[in-house]
Design a protein with these regions (language model features):
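Structured-RNA-binding interfaces characteristic of tRNA pseudouridine synthases
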Residues: 1-286, 296-301
Length: 301
C-alpha cells in the first residue's frame, strides 16, 4: 500500500493523560490520537512522537508523524482529527513530510518550559493545572541563576534521572545548551531548558534542585557536587509534573545556516544563563561540533 508520511504538530493539556506513550487500560495522548486515526483510516496506525512526555506533562508543540494511505490524500488531517479528539488535545497543523522524516530521530534539540507560581496565597484557579506553587513561594532567583550556570554544558546527568527507568545506548551524558527564565505573567516565572535530549524526569529533577537552591536548602556549590557525584539519592526531590510543558522541537531546517547541533536560544528571550556565554554561535553547538547524536529509542523526556 502506498503511503504518505504526515507530520503533525500537537498541543495538549496533560493533566488527565498518563503521558504520551500507549499503555494498556489508561488514557494516553498516543492512544487517543491513534484511536481517532483508526476511525478515519479504518485500520490501526502507529503515531511516533518527538518525545514521550510523562503523566501530567503538557505540550505546546509536540511533533509526531504517521503514514497515511495515499487514497486518503484529500483528507484535511488536522480538521478530521480535531473533530474526533477530546478538547484537551488539539492538532495544530498537519502536512506532508519527506518519506524518511522521523519525529524523534530527526529532532536536534528540544525546549521544555517549567512555570513556577511566585505569589503567596492560593493559585489562580485558571492556572492551577499548569504551574507549581512551592511553599514558601519566595525564592532567591540570583542563587538559582548561579546554580543553573553549573548545569550548562555536556555532563553526566545521572543525578538527575529517574532511577526506575532502564538506560538506553546513550547512557546518561547529555548537552544542556541553556537555561533561562522570563516572567510568564504577573505572578509567574518560567524557566526554560534546551538540550539535545533529556533523560526521563530530567527537567523536573533539575527544576526541583533549582527550587531547593532558591529556598536556601542547597547552595550552588552543592549543585556542582551533586552533578559530579552522579548519585540521584543525594539530589533534591523531583518537581511535580503540572508545571512542565514541551514547548518546541527543533529539526535540521530550524538550525542557523551551517549549524547542525543545537538551535540558538530564541532572540526574544533574555537568558539567565547559557552555555559558554562569550563563545558567540558556538554556545549552542554540540561538544566537538558535528551532528547531534540520534536519540536513543528508549529515551523518555
Amino acid at each position: 500500500m502506498k503511503t504518505t508520511r504526515i507530520k503533525l504538530m500537537l498541543a495538549y493539556d496533560g493533566t488527565d493523560f498518563c503521558g504520551w506513550q500507549h499503555q494498556g487500560g489508561v488514557r494516553t495522548v498516543q492512544s487517543d490520537v491513534e484511536a481517532a486515526l483508526a476511525k478515519i483510516i479504518g485500520e490501526p496506525t502507529h503515531v511516533q512522537a518527538a518525545g514521550r512526555t510523562d503523566s501530567g506533562v503538557h505540550a505546546l508543540a509536540q511533533c509526531a508523524h504517521f503514514d497515511a494511505p495515499q487514497r486518503l490524500s484529500h483528507v484535511p488531517w488536522d480538521k478530521a482529527l480535531n473533530g474526533l479528539l477530546a478538547p484537551d488535545v488539539r492538532v495544530l497543523s498537519a502536512q506532508a513530510a519527506a518519506p524518511g522524516f522521523h519525529a524523534q530521530f530527526d529532532a536536534r534539540s528540544k525546549i521544555y518550559a517549567y512555570t513556577i507560581w511566585l505569589e503567596r496565597g492560593p493559585v489562580n484557579p485558571l492556572r492551577r493545572r499548569f504551574v507549581w506553587s512551592p511553599r514558601p513561594p519566595r525564592l532567591d532567583l540570583a542563587a538559582m541563576d548561579e546554580a543553573a550556570a553549573v548545569l550548562i554544558g555536556t555532563h553526566d546527568f545521572n543525578s538527575f534521572r529517574n532511577l526506575g527507568t532502564p538506560l538506553g545506548d546513550r547512557g546518561t551524558v547529555r548537552t544542556l545548551a541553556g537555561i533561562w527564565r522570563e516572567p510568564g505573567g504577573p505572578s509567574e516565572m518560567v524557566w526554560r531548558f534546551q538540550a539535545n535530549g533529556f533523560l526521563k524526569q530530567m527537567v523536573r529533577n533539575l527544576m526541583g534542585c533549582l527550587v531547593a537552591v532558591g529556598r536556601g536548602k542547597v547552595t550552588p556549590a552543592d549543585v556542582r557536587l551533586i552533578l559530579e557525584k552522579r548519585d540521584r539519592s543525594i539530589a533534591p526531590p523531583t518537581a511535580p509534573a503540572m508545571g512542565l510543558c514541551m514547548e518546541r522541537v527543533f529539526y535540521p531546517e530550524d538550525m542557523p545556516s551551517g549549524q547542525q547541533g543545537l538551535a540558538e536560544t530564541p532572540q526574544n528571550a533574555r537568558p539567565a544563563v547559557a552555555a559558554s556565554k562569550d563563545a558567540g554561535h558556538d554556545e549552542h553547538q554540540m561538544a566537538g561540533g558535528g551532528h547531534s547524536p540520534r536519540p536513543d529509542p528508549h529515551e523518555r523526556d
